[in-house]
């Protein structure tokens, strides 16, 4: 897989990361900082742009979904991979996250990138096989950070 370099002009845009046509606002961006001041905190690491989103975006350029796919982004966080799929492949993306506090950040990122992402607050372990059938593709990046998540993730893969 060819590695995609991040924006070489990053020094002129210190609060934005440009990658594969997506503008990702960093946690230092004034609008992001404003949202952070309005919240009491995050419970599940949804507090910044995670580099794993860019790795997954790179992967998806090599193995793209069908255009206009129904996509579930498990542990979507600020939604950068969701935004990439919506913009690049006209995907209808639902971002799922256990942290309701990420939704304003996801919507801000989507607004900056002129696309829409559906947000659903909840855990993947509660999704049924029937619910999963509504999606053509299920993606996730950097979500297995607690040992007790391994078995529920395996169940998700089996049900999908």
Regions found by a protein language model. Name each.
Residues 1-160:
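S-adenosylmethionine-dependent methyltransferases
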């Amino acid at each position: 897989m060819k590695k995609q370099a991040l924006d070489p002009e990053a020094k002129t845009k210190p609060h934005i990361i440009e990658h594969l046509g997506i503008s990702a606002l960093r946690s230092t961006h004034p609008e992001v900082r404003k949202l952070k001041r309005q919240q009491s905190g995050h419970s599940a690491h949804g507090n910044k742009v995670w580099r794993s989103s860019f790795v997954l975006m790179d992967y998806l350029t090599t193995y793209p979904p069908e255009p206009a796919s129904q996509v579930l982004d498990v542990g979507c966080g600020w939604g950068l991979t969701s935004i990439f799929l919506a913009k690049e492949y006209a995907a209808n993306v639902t971002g799922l996250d256990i942290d309701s506090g990420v939704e304003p950040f996801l919507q801000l990122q989507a607004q900056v990138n002129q696309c829409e992402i559906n947000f659903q607050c909840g855990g993947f372990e509660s999704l049924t096989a029937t619910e999963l059938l509504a999606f053509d593709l299920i993606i996730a990046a950097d979500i297995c950070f607690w040992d007790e998540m391994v078995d529920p993730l395996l169940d998700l893969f089996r049900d999908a």
